Design a protein with these regions (language model features):
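Alpha-helical membrane-protein architecture signal
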Residues: 31, 35, 39, 73, ...
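A short, structured surface patch at a secondary-structure boundary
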Residues: 105-167, 211-219
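Short, glycine-rich, amphipathic interfacial segments at transmembrane boundaries or analogous
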Residues: 4, 8-15, 72-110, 171-192
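N-terminal hydrophobic signal-anchor/signal peptide
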Residues: 1-49, 161, 199, 220, ...
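Transmembrane helix and adjacent juxtamembrane "hinge" segments in multi-pass inner-membrane proteins
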Residues: 24-72, 211-214
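Membrane-interface alpha-helices
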Residues: 63-80, 224-226
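C-terminal terminal-structure detector
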Residues: 31, 159-226
């Protein structure tokens, strides 16, 4: 399976789901998992050291632009369904309580002026480097969804929870194939989930590297970013 984006439209419909969770866990292996964790720790620490001026400036702009905290915290489900608190820069003027989740949409009035810029280039996700240091997330893996979305889609998409057999990531296979942003229908979410499951099944350090290399190009394309 190559990484060329021109295959993305048909890719998700072609993924077989006939494999058990234990297969995906075994496919990673202890050595690969240890190397992946070492890479996560090293890269996250280096990126935080390099990017701290941008993080500080972003925090200041958020406080100047709208009333509310700098960070948005929300409970998400991580590896094997373990809950953790994800960190993001706040980009909305209305904070959700975690019980009634409404996805951000194009020209969403809740998004602040600064927040719109942050979301376009995914700077709002940078605090998740702290989640990576804590071991709650990885640089690469399925994006963690709000718990309300997990509950909703788990009842409507077969094998939905198989995506939780990998540690959630800041970027992933679904994202570099354009499956990011709003998922207005179950069908659109299913395509994203199938990409996540494909990643779990086909994990390799080389695949992680390719995803990391393609991520900046996808950010520049800004497909479905809002």
């Amino acid at each position: 399976m190559g990484l060329e984006h021109r295959y993305a439209d048909n890719f998700a419909d072609a993924i077989p789901l006939e494999f058990a969770p234990e297969e995906s866990e075994a496919s990673i292996g202890q050595l690969s998992a240890a190397v992946k964790r070492a890479i996560d720790l090293t890269a996250a620490a280096i990126l935080l050291l390099i990017l701290w001026p941008i993080l500080l400036l972003t925090a200041i702009l958020i406080r100047l632009d709208s009333i509310g905290p700098v960070f948005f915290r929300q409970t998400r489900l991580g590896l094997r369904g373990r809950p953790f608190h994800i960190l993001k820069f706040r980009t909305m003027s209305v904070l959700e309580d975690g019980e009634h989740i409404v996805q951000a949409t194009h020209n969403d009035p809740r998004i602040t002026r600064v927040g719109r810029i942050l979301r376009k280039i995914s700077i709002d996700e940078l605090p998740q480097l702290i989640n990576v240091l804590r071991g709650e997330m990885s640089l690469v893996g399925p994006r963690p969804h709000a718990r309300a979305h997990d509950e909703y889609y788990a009842q409507r998409i077969a094998n939905y929870t198989l995506r939780q057999q990998a540690k959630p990531g800041i970027t992933g296979w679904a994202q570099i194939n354009g499956f990011r942003g709003e998922t207005p229908t179950v069908h659109s979410m299913r395509k994203r989930i199938l990409c996540d499951i494909w990643y779990v099944r086909n994990f390799s350090l080389w695949l992680d590297l390719k995803i990391l290399l393609f991520t900046p190009f996808e950010l520049l394309r800004q497909r479905n970013a809002h």
